[in-house]
A protein has these predicted regions:
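C-terminal motif of bacterial Sec signal peptides marking the signal peptidase cleavage site
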Residues: 15-18
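Electrostatic cytochrome c docking/interface patches
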Residues: 26-49, 61-66, 83, 87
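The canonical Cys-X-X-Cys-His
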Residues: 44, 50-60, 133, 170, ...
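Short Fe-S-cluster ligation motifs
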Residues: 81-99
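Axial heme c-ligation environment in periplasmic c-type cytochrome domains
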Residues: 100, 106-126, 141-165
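C-terminal capping alpha-helices of c-type cytochrome domains
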Residues: 127-142, 158-186
């Protein structure tokens, strides 16, 4: 029995010794390393795609395969030129949500909210700083301004957990896309009928 224990301890010692001499594998650049501007923009595009920003911030066009993002209006938010159809009178206010067909506007118990213009035009985020953009995502502050109202649903609140590097990458990408002029209507509280 003692021989078996000694053999087991010796084997364990040799395994641990073998592990000690192993060199760590090469890792991908850490998030806190400084990225080149092109890589930051590429990372930002990746994040915008993965997070589904265009799902709500890009008007859709109907195709043979169903609705698709209208890339000529990429990330311009609710198209103010189209207006919002009226909420049907037979639909009572309640704990439900109605979306415009292209998902750029939502009506619910909080009121009516519109997807913002994320392009670098001055009617979008063109004049924003990285600090404002970070505050908008982290603290859900409208336009990233300290004393502003909260951003309204359906804007996801879990974006607050993005890293500083991911937010900077998203911001860099958004600042690199085509600027589109589009003044999005302001939020309307539930007592105000939706604009049509």
């Amino acid at each position: 029995m003692r021989l078996k224990i000694n053999a087991l301890l010796t084997a364990l010692f040799l395994v641990l010794l073998a592990c000690k001499d192993q060199k760590p594998t090469e890792t991908v650049a850490m998030a806190n390393d400084t990225m080149e501007p092109e890589n930051l923009i590429d990372r930002g595009k990746y994040m915008v795609d993965v997070l589904g920003c265009a799902d709500c911030h890009t008007p859709k066009k109907m195709t043979a395969h169903g609705p698709e993002n209208d890339m000529s209006r990429y990330l311009m938010g609710f198209d103010s030129a189209e207006g919002l159809p009226p909420v049907p009178e037979n639909v009572p206010m309640g704990p439900w949500v109605l979306f415009k067909g292209d998902l750029t506007a939502a009506v619910g118990p909080w009121g009516t909210s519109y997807a913002g213009n994320l392009t670098p035009h001055e009617t979008g985020i063109g004049t924003w700083t990285l600090e404002q953009f970070t505050k908008a995502l982290r603290e859900a502050k409208y336009k990233g301004l300290e004393d502003s109202r909260p951003m309204m649903p359906p804007m996801p609140r879990h974006y607050a957990y993005l890293t500083d590097e991911d937010i900077a990458a998203i911001f860099s990408y958004l600042k690199s896309i085509k600027p589109l002029e589009n003044v999005v209507p302001g939020y309307q509280p539930p007592s105000t009928p939706p604009k049509s």
